[in-house]
Amino acid sequence: MSDLFSYEGKKVVLTGGTTGVGAAAVELLAEAGCTDLTVLDIKEPTGPATRYIPTDMSDPDSIDEAIASIGSGVDVLFNNAGVAGVHPTDFVIRVNCLGVRRLTEGVLPGMPKGGAIVNTASIAGQGWPDNLAKILEFIGIDDWASAVQWVADNDELASADVYAFSKQIAQVWTMYSSVRSFKEFGVRTNSVCPGPIDTPLMDDFIKHMTEQVIQWTVDQSGGTMLTADDIARTLVMLGTDASLAMNGHNMVADNGFSAAMTTSQIDFSGLG
């Protein structure tokens, strides 16, 4: 049974491994036996990663250099790097969406059958059905510059809540890309959709969403905010054989907030 969760002998790549969920995942992967872990980030991680490649996920050239350096044979790719909505719209989309796609498409052809791709999405992206047609239009644009131009041309949609929109794209991209990744390469693609997490990024989320909204969300799901370790455990699990039959799934990890919302057990009075 323990082999189901083992990372022994696996080549792993993780983006955003310096702080928060990524840093917690680095520790857990080491505990699970991973001895070939490459972290892509703009800052060097302090955890037990075996290799660090300085990478700017908003810059296609930087990503391409990382892909060349990584080489083939990646068993598990964690697309974890992300930014909050306090940044300019095009920057958020480049990091949270375009960078994820470029890295994935560069690494995937060299991944062995049975591998896994795990994206970090968010429950903030659960409104994707309302924008599905536009999101598929965006996903259908292969060229980086053209995709950035699409964001500018659709500024009213993208800028209304750019973080939420970027995570809508992340959820749809997970489903969309999972079809090709599994049919052509035998590689599963899933995402984790957390609620509010107690990480250094929380300050940016408070600026963007207000502390009242964050606390209200936590209060509606048991009153306990998620920790980086909570979500890292879910990420790490999705990269193992324990989730062998899962593909194209956006796994919600929010202490039950979405369940309460879906079943009309939410108290909106806390929003004022």
Model regions: which residues?
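Short C-terminal tail/terminal secondary-structure segment
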Residues: 2-3, 247-272
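N-terminal Rossmann NAD(P)H-binding glycine-rich loop of SDR-like oxidoreductase domains
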Residues: 18, 22-27
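Rossmann-fold cofactor-recognition segment
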Residues: 46-61
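Catalytic loop of short-chain dehydrogenase/reductase
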Residues: 84-85, 90, 113-184, 196-197
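Catalytic Tyr-x(3-8)-Lys segment
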Residues: 155-160, 211-230
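Short, small/polar-rich loop/turn modules that mediate ligand/substrate recognition or access, typified
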Residues: 183, 188, 246-248
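C-terminal substrate-recognition "lid" of short-chain dehydrogenase/reductases
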Residues: 224-253, 258
